[in-house]
Amino acid sequence: MTTRTIDNIRNFSIVAHIDHGKSTLADRLIQQTGTVALRDMSEQMLDSMDIERERGITIKANTVRLEYKAEDGQDYVLNLMDTPGHVDFAYEVSRSLAACEGSLLVVDASQGVEAQTLANVYQALDANHEIVPVLNKVDLPAAEPDRVKEQIEEVIGLDASEAVPISAKTGLNIEAVLEAIVKRLPPPKGDREAPLKALLVDSWYDVYLGVVVLVRIVDGVLKKGMTIRMMGADAAYGVDRIGVFRPKMADIGELGPGEVGFFTGSIKEVADTRVGDTITEDKRQTTQMLPGFKEVQAVVFCGLFPVDAADFENLRGAMGKLRLNDASFSYEMETSAALGFGFRCGFLGLLHLEIIQERLEREFNLDLISTAPSVVYRLMMRDGELKELHNPADMPDPMKIETVEEPWIRATILTPDDYLGGVLKLCQDRRGIQIDLNYVGKRAMVVYDLPLNEVVFDFYDRLKSISKGYASFDYHVSDYREGDLVKMSILVNAEPVDALSMLVHRTRAESRGRAMCEKLKDLIPRHLFQIPVQAAIGGKIIARETIRALSKDVTAKCYGGDISRKRKLLDKQKEGKKRMRQFGRVEIPQEAFIAALKMDD
């Protein structure tokens, strides 16, 4: 590599909405440049997890080095950074984009620009990227390349006259994409003689190598045997092995400025290698950290409990292993009277939550119950203390609380205008505040501020069903705002059930409580005594349903005879039921929990 100059390197990422053919295009580029022999090719080369392939999404950032001989006769090294497309992983996307100078914007020629395309393009523009638009799926009968070009110019403001029309599936025009990368994207800048400065793009745990760190070198050279320092985590390590991905790992001697590769060292914990950190040489340190490094904050919390209590230790081990690979996932132990021992886990968003739960169930064979997802509330106490509340069951006495603040998000929704009315109504029902409404061709772009609390429950599913699956949705957490929030407890037979308590807005508490009670009434089996199911705010009951008792016909053996004989038997039964109600325990089956937590509005 030392023979080639920095001018012959191109670092680029592919920006696209889910399902617009990003991973397929990556496959074609790998194939076209002969990086992988044809017999070793598989679909979605860069999506290494099964779950990534099945859901057709990219979760972890990946990278591959392509070597390409261009029409001008020169050899180029192209580093493709494959980024996650989903909003939960926006920070990973921003770090991957910071490691590149340019992006390919892939837009499906039949679908047009979607909400996440927008979010990711704006991130790429923030990173000062040169952007080459690519129209994918032009071989489909429904493709309308000219309309989509207009859309790109209108919505994003990019000149789409030179957009490259391709079909990643059939391999049409892939050569033109490679030429566009070489000609239209800028080479990296960097000083070989300066002290080492590198951006930590991603890291993961490998059973044999320990922690593998993916880096983009900005200045200086990374060599074997060097001692490096992570500036954000303030830890030093020796470098054992350096290499690049041709998707498989291949060792090389050193990485120079502008290059992307990996190194391994004596690193034990992925938590020490934080995405976005700056890496420098321990002896000759760089003075300035790279900008944009931040700690990843969990946004959504929920409890995960094993269905079988004997699995608790296995669950603890499984979480430790996942945490090795995904430092943005956090957990701590908690106990629940209803569900036993488990963990309170923090996630970047709902998709992240689903994926972690699915990976735990699939990779470690665990059966799990998850409690209702909740967000982090800030409580301003009367004594001036600021508390963070992760679990609604831990809410302190309301008399001690001055104000409750909840996180709000700025959501961008793109929808065909036929469904606009339904989408606006949904946002209004969820306490949304409309910020903006624009038309782009036949589609409306709506911007709303919404409380995250209203979105975590089932907002996405409702949005999809209202718009027949056509609306796309993207959000980022904007700020905390004061809200009139109250803790709603569910009481079964006058006993509070901790797993079902939740924080709700006062205006929606009654409807939420009534729905919950009705649902539980159908789910809890009848007992020999009457069971009240109540929703309460503090000491005030706001909704109640009663599960009727099963009763035995105690008078069946009396034929005729005196009425007082029957009355005696009935009174005796009544006494027994009363005593039973006082001391009886209500068994709430696990299915009832799972169904109650999946409650639709």
Swiss-Prot record:
What species does this protein belong to? Methylorubrum populi (strain ATCC BAA-705 / NCIMB 13946 / BJ001) (Methylobacterium populi)
Gene that codes for this? Answer: lepA
User: What name has this protein been given in UniProt?
Assistant: Elongation factor 4
- Chief location of this protein within or outside the cell: membrane
Looking at the record, the residues that make up the tr-type G domain are: 7-189
Q: Does the keyword Cell membrane apply?
A: yes
Which PANTHER family does the UniProt record give? TRANSLATION FACTOR GUF1 HOMOLOG, CHLOROPLASTIC (PTHR43512:SF4), TRANSLATION FACTOR GUF1-RELATED (PTHR43512)
Q: What class of enzyme is it?
A: hydrolase
The residues that hold GTP are 19-24, 136-139
Question: EC annotation?
Answer: 3.6.5.n1
- Where does the record say this protein resides? Cell inner membrane
Q: How does it sit in the membrane?
A: Peripheral membrane protein
